[in-house]
From Swiss-Prot:
Name assigned to this protein: Type III pantothenate kinase
Entry keyword Repeat: no
InterPro entries named in the record: ATPase_NBD, Type_III_PanK
Gene that this polypeptide is encoded by: coaX
Originating species: Burkholderia cenocepacia (strain ATCC BAA-245 / DSM 16553 / LMG 16656 / NCTC 13227 / J2315 / CF5610) (Burkholderia cepacia (strain J2315))
Any one Pfam family match given in the protein's UniProt record, by short name: Pan_kinase
One GO term (biological process): coenzyme A biosynthetic process
Role of this protein: Catalyzes the phosphorylation of pantothenate (Pan), the first step in CoA biosynthesis.
Catalytic reaction list: (R)-pantothenate + ATP = (R)-4'-phosphopantothenate + ADP + H(+)
Pathway: Cofactor biosynthesis; coenzyme A biosynthesis; CoA from (R)-pantothenate: step 1/5
Ligand binding (substrate): Y96, G103, S104, D105, R106, T189
Enzyme Commission code: 2.7.1.33
Co-factor binding details: A monovalent cation. Ammonium or potassium.
Amino acid sequence: MSEPHLLIDAGNSRIKWALADARRTLVDTGAFGHTRDGGADPDWSRLPRPRGAWISNVAGADVAARIDALLDARWPGLPRTTIRSRPAQCGVTNGYTTPEQLGSDRWAGLIGAHAAFPGEHLLIATFGTATTLEALRADGCFTGGLIAPGWALMMRALGTHTAQLPTLTTDIASGLLAGAQAEPFQVDTPRSLSAGCLYAQAGLIERAWRDLVAAWQAPVRLVLAGGAADDVARALTIAHTRHDTLILSGLALIAADAADPATAPD
């Protein structure tokens, strides 16, 4: 059996990892913080030595150094590749005017989505520090995207830049809305802020989806991913699919393609 690939997705909030076997199946997964203060280091002691590490990092140089130190401590000299967006890869064509400007996480997610839902037009909504939307045609052409503040960032901005509004986390906001009435309008300030920012997320998604369906004159599957996906999903009135491993799955495809280009999807 060939050695597995170690996949690392370093986002703006945390670092996720997975081990992918020869069939590109994610056989082991985990997550850890940007710093040791953000939680324990990953426990890789029981993992076999991988063939190499494939990394998407949008979190900066300090996080890159942390990942390198962890890899060197467990597997000295392990080959590693930090991916960059390309004009085309693994069946996906990058529609950005300057392809390398597209975040590596979004690029890997597009590759993962194209493989997960073959032959379908997709709108991919990912909820992190930022909310990102990607329009992906069934033929693998990424036609463009949108970037907006995420749910947490919206609430933090209101709390920080106003005198009387509270600063709420997504955990607090989710708890406040868990028992909320069906009526969307709330009767206290914390719930009004929580629901207003949540509806802003849902409204963005639904408007983008409807515009895409109208532009393409074809069905479009809405795919949700990211930490706030469950909360936003409750506010949506359109059908959607949840998929939380698009980036790691895309990294697995990129790694497999590099190891054996003949295995890459068309």
